[in-house]
Amino acid sequence: MNNKVGLAHSLRDGQKYMDTWPMRKELSAIFPEQRIIKATRFGIKVMPAIAAISVLTQMAFNNYQALPQAIVMALFALSLPLQGMWWLGHRSNTQLPPALATWYRELHQKIVESGSALEPLKSRPRYKELAHTLNRAFRHLDKSALERWF
């Protein structure tokens, strides 16, 4: 698989990964995804307003000399959520390190043993497969089955 994907593909993968990743406090100490997802969602809500205010404030005070700087600041503010989604998209397509791949396989096996339907085990899993597996584990396994890992 080609690891170099386009920007639009990375942004789309980041959006899917953001929706797939389980937002559980048990995972926040292990993975940075929860912090990145919260910051990206906050940026999606807040940064367009900050961008508009930075430009409109200069226009309201007739400070047209500062308008180019305000536009640059607005573009930077608008780029912050895109940077978060790009990072998430890139992360979702990154292969798991060996220790996490072993953990993914054990968790996958535990879900299959419990009788839940799950996609086939990947030989070279990526973070997006881990997200799907973790999501399924938190939904279908009881706390006693998850005690070993959390």
From Swiss-Prot:
Protein keywords: Cell inner membrane, Cell membrane, Membrane, Transmembrane, Transmembrane helix
Membrane-spanning residues: 42-62, 70-90
One GO CC term on file: plasma membrane
Membrane topology: Multi-pass membrane protein
Localization, UniProt: Cell inner membrane
Signal peptide: none
InterPro entries in the record: UPF0208
Entry-linked Pfam families: DUF412
Recorded family membership: Belongs to the UPF0208 family.
Name of the protein in question: UPF0208 membrane protein VV2132
Organism lineage string: Bacteria, Pseudomonadati, Pseudomonadota, Gammaproteobacteria, Vibrionales
